[in-house]
Design a protein with these regions (language model features):
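A late C-terminal transmembrane helix in Major Facilitator Superfamily
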Residues: 329-363
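Intracellular juxtamembrane helix-capping segments at the cytosolic ends
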Residues: 114-127, 318-332
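Cytoplasmic helix-loop-helix junction between adjacent transmembrane helices
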Residues: 104-140
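Extracytoplasmic gate region of multi-pass secondary transporters
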Residues: 22-23, 212-263
Length: 398
């Protein structure tokens, strides 16, 4: 169990690292140092998705070949570079600070892929009697970290000699923790059960060569894109909307409500899936998100922003992507490995493309884009649900 705790702590700090650039106060501090608009920091968040996209094709095979320990160590070390790099980029200011941060964010995205491919199977092997609980533990640690983030920001804020607001203390602390976790990962025992079977596994490119994709399977892959866009656009841009359109001076507490929604959803959705088919959630949750986004855009008030943060955290980030992969495995058993990989690639592609586009928009325009993207997700979810009976019958006969 000490090994499992070390692995979970990697995701606790990841919970801060993956959402820190979405905080309005962080954006403003970095933007002031680099001489750019606050929304331009969203492009740095997009670079995380680019790094993840770059690493996806080889992180998994390397994890199987080299073992969970090496994969996790690469992830921890790379994440330390990303976080400490953000502090160094802030210090660089207009002398290449933005470029340094972009490169470090790509490294952070690569770190994310290696943590995923190392830690997900490792905790499932450690807690082998309850692998679903092991996976839920990862999401739990991420949500807890994101919930306390606004309070951590308040405790680590400082002012530089030149009068700039700085959060470098937080970047350095998290980076050093990852270095410590890297050392612990190398010292404590980790399972490598899948390493023996690495040579027998077919690569994604090889499997694509002889895989037939139906319209429904393509729809499921696209849902990986749309559902990711819903919560990523909110996570990275909603606080800017609250500041500029609602007039909320410090909306960072929205992160706590968002994470609370995610945390509760992890438990409640797990219970609901015992009574309700997984496929129903891939239309129900996007519908809830769509209605929420429309109300928030139309109402523009603090109470609506708080309620919106909680609801999007629940219905958008509370396991919808994982439910989509679960439906893929059920409906397309012959290509479940391939289609699941493609869903995750679509998710990473969304992180990069949508956030890159958002960096060039006003917060209200981003909200409209999120509404359109979520509406497409609703249409895709409806299509898969209409076809569900036929697809399930085909899967059972396969």
């Amino acid at each position: 169990m000490p090994s499992a705790l070390i692995l979970y702590l990697n995701y606790f700090i990841h919970g801060i690292g993956c959402s820190i650039l979405g905080q309005a106060v962080i954006k403003e501090a970095l933007a002031a140092s680099w001489g750019v608009e606050a929304m331009a920091i969203t492009a740095i968040s997009a670079a995380l998705g680019l790094g993840r996209l770059i690493a996806l094709p080889f992180a998994g095979p390397l994890s199987d070949k080299l073992g969970r320990r090496i994969s996790t160590a690469i992830g921890s070390g790379s994440y330390a570079i990303y976080l400490i790099g953000l502090a160094l980029a802030f210090n660089a200011g207009t002398n290449g600070g933005y470029t340094i941060a972009y490169v470090c964010a790509i490294i952070g995205g690569i770190a994310n892929s290696f943590l995923d491919t190392g830690i997900y199977p490792a905790v499932a092997e450690i807690i082998y009697k309850a692998p679903s609980v092991a996976t839920m533990g990862i999401k739990f640690f991420i949500a807890i970290a994101q919930m306390i983030l606004p309070f951590v920001l308040g405790a680590t804020v400082a002012t530089t000699a030149t009068g700039l607001v700085s959060y470098n203390m937080l970047f350095y602390i998290c980076g050093v923790i990852y270095v410590v976790l890297l050392v612990l990962v190398m010292l404590f025992p980790l399972p490598d059960a899948d390493q023996k079977a690495a040579g027998k596994k077919e690569g994604l490119i090889d499997s694509l060569k002889h895989t037939h994709f139906s319209i429904e399977s393509v729809a499921m892959i696209l849902i990986g894109f749309t559902c990711t866009g819903t919560f990523q656009l909110w996570l990275n841009c909603a606080q800017n909307f609250a500041k500029e359109n609602v007039g909320w001076a410090d909306p960072s507490i929205m992160q706590t409500y968002y994470s609370a929604g995610t945390l509760i959803a992890l438990v409640v959705t797990a219970l609901l899936t015992r009574k309700i088919k997984d496929v129903r959630f891939i239309v129900a949750y996007p519908v809830i998100c769509l209605a929420t986004l429309i109300v928030v855009l139309a109402g523009q008030s603090k109470p609506l922003m708080i309620a919106g943060a909680f609801i999007i955290g629940w219905a958008g980030a509370g396991g919808l992507l994982q439910l989509a992969t679960s439906v893929c495995n059920m409906l397309f058993p012959k290509i479940k490995g391939t289609i699941t990989a493609l869903v995750m690639i679509a998710s990473s592609l969304c992180n990069y493309t949508i956030l890159t586009a958002a960096a060039k928009m006003q917060p209200s325009q981003v909200m409209v884009m999120n509404i359109v993207l979520t509406a497409v997700g609703v249409a895709l979810g409806l299509f898969v649900n209409v076809r569900y009976g036929v697809l399930l019958k085909n899967a059972e006969e396969a």
